[in-house]
Amino acid sequence: MTDYAVLFRELAIPRLAGTPNHQKVREILKRELMARGFSVEQQAFRGRPARALLGTPRVVAGTNLIAQRLSGGPTVGPSVWLVAHYDSKGQPISMAVRLVGFFALLLGFVTLFVALLPALAILAVAFVIVSQNRVTDNSPGAVDNATALVAIFMTIDQLSSGARVGVVFSDAEEFGLVGARSLAAERSSLFAAAALINLDSLDDTGRSTAFVHRRGRIGGAVADALKARQWRWLPVIVDGIALSAVCRECVTILKGDWQTMRIIHRPADSVARVRLDGAASVAAGLARVLRAE
């Protein structure tokens, strides 16, 4: 039986894509998947990081893990894919500060047409914040996104071995959905007839949120089981945005509050503040829905 707390501590280490820790975490994930009877495909890719990020290489290389359970019968693809990115990143500013900068930028541009001097002051603050949007490797990424990795293992451990559920551990999400975009471009046939449930940042505190990219029955059932608030747009960048175009339905599940956003991408996003209650509650709700399929 898996000790999820031990697994969590193994995974929640700084693991910027391309670093030795990043490779170490990938091997741990492969180990855990194969121990559960999954066949693991490694999809290597290269892509350009998001232009909004500073201090990044011109090209990012990564490896997506695509896992399906071995079967002795006819090959039938998963009807549901559970997805979570396994890379992490640090930044000089938290997600909360970055959101403040984003809204300040919008407010500044709108105010330009009303009051020039206040608009310039707001834009100056926004540009100072944006200038701190650099990538580092100093965050353990416990909430973002080791909690989701553990939640996927918790979920599949509550399902039968015959459940038609696949797993994708995507890479280089923190560089601008590079791995997810590669999956959509090169492996779209895997997801065409399936529901895709992306997990991202599952804190112990706060309420669950369902970021609905493409509506569907399973995604709706998951949102209901978690009593999640449902939104069609949120000011966050998640893999579901890139993958929703190639699957039958797609939702991203997040869990947290303002305090969560204050620690994401910072050194404080560590195992010391996470009990895995959020991951366990999301996994339990997911498993209930998937067992009924």
Residue ranges and their predicted role:
Residues 2, 16-27, 142-146, 150, ...:
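Soluble non-cytosolic domains of exported or imported proteins
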Residues 78-85:
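Short beta-strand element of the alpha/beta-hydrolase
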Residues 3-6, 24, 28, 179-182, ...:
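Extracytoplasmic/secreted proteins, especially bacterial periplasmic and envelope-associated proteins
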Residues 7, 13-73, 93-109, 121:
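A non-catalytic alpha/beta surface segment that caps or lines the substrate-entry region
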Residues 1-25, 30-32, 36, 50-56, ...:
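N-terminal capping segment at the start of a domain
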Residues 41, 81, 166-168:
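A structural signal for isolated positions on well-ordered beta-strands in alpha/beta enzyme cores
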Residues 90-93, 107-108, 118-221, 232-242:
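Acidic/histidine-rich catalytic neighborhood of metal-dependent amide-processing enzymes
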Residues 44, 194-195, 202-293:
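Active-site-adjacent substrate-binding region
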